[in-house]
């Protein structure tokens, strides 16, 4: 009996392994089909070079994220210069939650089969040249929250089936769609900007008891006016020159720019209980951050800026705020809106459920688990992607100037979200000496910025490198407490000394309790040292950092740097020789899937 049970157990294990392999192979086949459709040009082949048809699962491939069951949950191929068409085989990824193929050169139609991706939360196909209709099958995606199809060549009518979806974000503007805008379902919450620059008819007005001729004239007038408003709104969005009248808070209109809103002071006073001290989430050099609850029960974080008011700065403030709002990436804190009165400047963000990396490392409540090593790796990658977007993909480059663990926020699934970007410029929009006014936090400020006051994207790279050391050690970038042990008060200097004299484990946060991979720690230290080189020119760009974190080029860059720096740095790098970067892809055990932040800071 015992022997039979053992044999049955073995067969069960073999069967489960077989099922796993079959499932994995199906996913491999689906992604290879996608690669075949998109593999035009050397750049594409390089982007997808790790996609190997001989693999059992695709979970080790670049730009692919899996869950603990080795099921693909995310494809990250935005802004990858891809061309070709989507393939119906994508439906063979049943656990896919995030499909990101935005800002490429993709043509053809959206496959009907995407409607079979029942776990899909976000579909981002914007800024391509996709044609044909929006498939009505997308209406089956009961978990879809983010649908962004704008800046394509889509035609036909908006499927009525989409109105039943629980959408938080919808943007199908700048296409060739026609017909009526549905008025039922979740569509009612979206402004005209979500549908702008199409051939769509506005939502029908209620019938009037006036004579038929007058009614017809009214309808024509409404339609013409709506069309004019659509065009004007689209122009405002593209040119970033929107202007809101600064009226007293009690009379503030509800003004939207896409999903971006001007809030009234009254509703933010109610949301924060008149900026109650018990709602304070944090205080920084830009102002105080409060937790708030809007009338629809949505949690937000409201930053009450402390900058000095000057006459005539309202339009410039609005322009800068709107510029910040246009930076949309899942690793950037999304600006929901603002409030401006003669006496107040406020910014409204989604509430970040898990606070900041700094608070998770050093201020976590008793009973809350420490950030584990896989999460720390994912935070390193996510924050790098967000900064790279600010530097390379915004209409106007945004330099953060204060990259640190306290400004890397974590949503409910511990996805890293870069916060407070754009505020350095926003708070100095009327300062003629902005180029020489040093901003930042001691311990994170790049040496060239400190000495000259001149910043560049390499200033952010330095701050990012120090933030990596915060992730590894759990310590502050500047800490007078280290003087008690005759250690350097600057984290970067302390790390270098420890590398000279002590073992690697002396650096790693004790909160990890030894649960980390030594080679991975070494590689993140290598990355941090490359990013914090004294010469700004020698530091990598954030886009290069992302590529190295994804497994491309760290070993070569590190070897090159060692040859140049060995006479200067007096510690034995050969004691830590591991240069492999396989782990640096988005880790396959990730449960981090949320596309938009929603919680405290």
From Swiss-Prot:
This is Somatic embryogenesis receptor kinase 5. SMART domains: S_TKc. Autophosphorylated. LRR repeats lie at residues 71-94, 95-118, 119-141, 143-165, 166-188. ATP binds at residues 281-289, 303. It comes from the Eukaryota. Belongs to the protein kinase superfamily. Ser/Thr protein kinase family. One of its GO terms (biological process) is protein phosphorylation. The active site is at 402 (proton acceptor). Serine/threonine-kinase of unknown function. The keyword Aminoacyl-tRNA synthetase does not apply. Residues 275-572 form the Protein kinase domain.
């Amino acid at each position: 009996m015992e022997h039979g049970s053992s044999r049955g157990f073995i067969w069960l294990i073999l069967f489960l392994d077989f099922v796993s392999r079959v499932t994995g192979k199906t996913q491999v086949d689906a992604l290879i089909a996608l690669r075949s459709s998109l593999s035009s040009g050397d750049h594409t082949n390089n982007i997808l070079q790790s996609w190997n048809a001989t693999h059992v699962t695709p979970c080790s491939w670049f730009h692919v994220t899996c869950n603990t069951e080795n099921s693909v949950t995310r494809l990250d191929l935005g802004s990858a210069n891809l061309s070709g068409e989507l393939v119906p085989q994508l439906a063979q990824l049943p656990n896919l939650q995030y499909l990101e193929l935005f800002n490429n050169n993709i043509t053809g139609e959206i496959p009907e089969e995407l409607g079979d991706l029942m776990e899909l939360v976000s579909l981002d196909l914007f800024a391509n040249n996709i044609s044909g209709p929006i498939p009505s099958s997308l209406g089956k995606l009961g978990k879809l929250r983010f649908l962004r199809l704008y800046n394509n060549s889509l035609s036909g009518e908006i499927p009525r089936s989409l109105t039943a979806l629980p959408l938080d974000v919808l943007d199908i503007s700048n296409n060739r769609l026609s017909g009526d805008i549905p008025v039922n379902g979740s569509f009612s919450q979206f402004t005209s900007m979500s549908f702008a620059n199409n051939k769509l008819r506005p939502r029908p007005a209620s019938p009037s008891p006036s004579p038929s001729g007058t009614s017809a004239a009214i309808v024509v007038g409404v339609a013409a006016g709506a069309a004019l408003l659509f065009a004007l709104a689209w122009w405002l969005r593209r040119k970033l020159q929107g202007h809101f009248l600064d009226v007293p808070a009690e009379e503030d209109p509800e003004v939207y720019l896409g999903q971006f809103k001007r809030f009234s002071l009254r509703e933010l006073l109610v949301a924060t209980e008149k900026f109650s001290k018990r709602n304070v989430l944090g205080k920084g050099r830009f102002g105080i951050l409060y937790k708030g609850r809007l009338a629809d029960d949505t949690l937000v974080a409201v930053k009450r800026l402390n900058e000095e008011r000057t006459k005539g700065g309202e339009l410039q403030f609005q322009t800068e705020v709107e510029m910040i709002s246009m930076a949309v990436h899942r690793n950037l804190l999304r600006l929901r809106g603002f409030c401006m009165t003669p006496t107040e400047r406020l910014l409204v963000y989604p509430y970040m459920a898990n606070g900041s990396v700094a608070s998770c490392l050093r201020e976590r409540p008793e009973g809350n688990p420490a950030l584990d090593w896989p999460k720390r790796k994912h935070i390193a990658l996510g924050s790098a992607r967000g900064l790279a977007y600010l530097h390379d993909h915004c209409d106007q480059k945004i330099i953060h100037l204060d990259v640190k663990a306290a400004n890397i926020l974590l949503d409910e699934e511990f996805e890293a979200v870069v916060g407070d970007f754009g505020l350095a410029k926003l708070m100095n929009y009327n300062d003629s000496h902005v180029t020489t006014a040093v901003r930042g936090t001691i311990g994170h400020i790049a040496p060239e910025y400190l000495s000259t006051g001149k910043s560049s994207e390499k200033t952010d790279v330095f701050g990012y490198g120090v933030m990596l050391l915060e992730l590894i050690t759990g310590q502050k970038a500047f800490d007078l407490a280290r003087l008690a042990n005759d250690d350097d008060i600057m984290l970067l200097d302390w790390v270098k000394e420890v590398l000279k004299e002590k073992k690697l484990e002396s650096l790693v946060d004790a909160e990890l309790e030894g649960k980390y991979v030594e080679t991975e720690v070494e590689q993140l230290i290598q990355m941090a040292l490359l990013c914090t080189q004294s010469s700004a020119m020698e530091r990598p760009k954030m886009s290069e950092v992302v590529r190295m974190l994804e497994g491309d080029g760290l070993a070569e860059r590190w070897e090159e740097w060692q040859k140049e720096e060995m006479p200067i740095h007096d510690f034995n790098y050969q004691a830590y020789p591991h240069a492999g970067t396989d782990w640096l892809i988005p880790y396959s055990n990730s449960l981090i899937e949320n596309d938009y932040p929603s919680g405290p800071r």
